[in-house]
Regions:
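Short, surface-exposed basic-aromatic patches at helix termini and helix-loop junctions that form
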Residues: 21-25, 185-186, 238-242
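Catalytic micro-motifs at enzyme active sites that drive phosphoryl/nucleotidyl and oxygen chemistry
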Residues: 15-23, 163-168, 174
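Activation/maturation switch segments at domain boundaries
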Residues: 1-114
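Residues in well-ordered beta-strands of folded domains
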Residues: 8, 33-35, 160, 189-191, ...
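Metal-dependent nuclease catalytic core centered on acidic motifs
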Residues: 108-167, 193-263
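Metal-dependent catalytic core segments for phosphate chemistry
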Residues: 181
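Conserved catalytic cores of phosphodiester-cleaving nucleases, focusing on short active-site segments
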Residues: 175, 184-192
Length: 263
């Protein structure tokens, strides 16, 4: 699977498709090529299931392992969890396993698919030449966003920039309205805070997140900020994600690692 998180997850476990019938399996938004195995010792050039399984576990570790996902499941509002269980045949164990799969697919789809499949990194990418031109022009004046994207890709996240504004028709004097979108095509919103060390700066960045369309994860990068410590940044981020009802932010700290900060 080159584009589908579900198929990338399945590929981590070797040849799952043992029959032609199983190979016909599909799911929403899937455009992946299915390679069935009908015998022992099957091989596909470039396919590294052992390496992919290691990277699967790396993604699982990011989410806190199964224990961390159980904590999420347990913290889910009772009505939401019961509805999830009901949707899976009133079997709590099956429902939790489906929840684990769902969260893993969400995490894998944030990652660089080239890295997930092969261990190699794609680098910064752009959906088209217009986006590339606009970004390169902007980065000449302020390279912070580019630096953060490079660091994210080095940490195995997909760093593909797209048009981060949608222009829709609207019944106003301009005849249109502009809706801001996440910075990256995966739904990652980048907040690079290098030159400021005030609480208000963190507040304004966090406050803007709910107003953007399609944000799946926000990364706050303070790795090169000499005016604020990781500890202080964590306190401010925690304060404002609670205030603005944001479930999670990942902070890129001075040690170059991503830290999950949950509401």
């Amino acid at each position: 699977g080159e584009t589908c998180g579900f198929c990338l997850m399945l590929s981590s476990f070797g040849f799952n498709y043992k029959t032609k019938e199983a190979a016909s399996h599909s799911h929403p938004k899937c455009d992946c090529r299915v390679v069935p195995s009908f015998g022992k010792g099957s091989k596909v050039k470039g396919y590294d299931p052992d390496g992919m399984y290691d990277r699967f576990n790396e993604c699982l570790d990011t989410l806190g392992g199964r224990n961390g996902l159980w904590a999420e499941w347990d913290a889910m509002p009772d009505a939401e969890r019961e509805a999830y269980i009901k949707a899976h045949g009133n079997k709590a164990g099956k429902a939790f396993d489906k929840y684990v799969n769902k969260r893993m697919v969400e995490e894998i789809e944030l990652r660089d698919p080239k890295w997930y499949a092969s261990g190699e990194h794609s680098g910064i990418e752009f959906t088209d030449s217009a986006v590339k031109g606009e970004k390169l022009k902007r980065w000449k004046k302020d390279p912070g966003e580019r630096i953060t994207a490079e660091k994210l890709n080095a940490l195995c996240y997909k760093a593909e920039f797209w048009e981060d504004e949608s222009h829709l028709t609207a019944p106003n004097s301009d005849g249109k309205t502009t809706i801001s979108r996440a910075d990256l095509s995966t739904g990652i919103e980048i907040k690079t805070i290098y030159g400021a060390g005030s609480e208000n700066t963190f507040k304004s960045h966090i406050k803007s997140i709910p107003g953007k369309n399609g944000v799946k994860l926000t990364v706050v990068d303070v790795s090169e900020n000499e005016k604020v410590t990781d500890e202080q940044a964590i306190k401010w981020i925690s304060k404002y994600i609670a205030r603005y009802h944001i479930s999670e932010v990942r902070m890129l700290g001075h040690d170059g690692k991503l830290l999950r900060i949950k509401k």
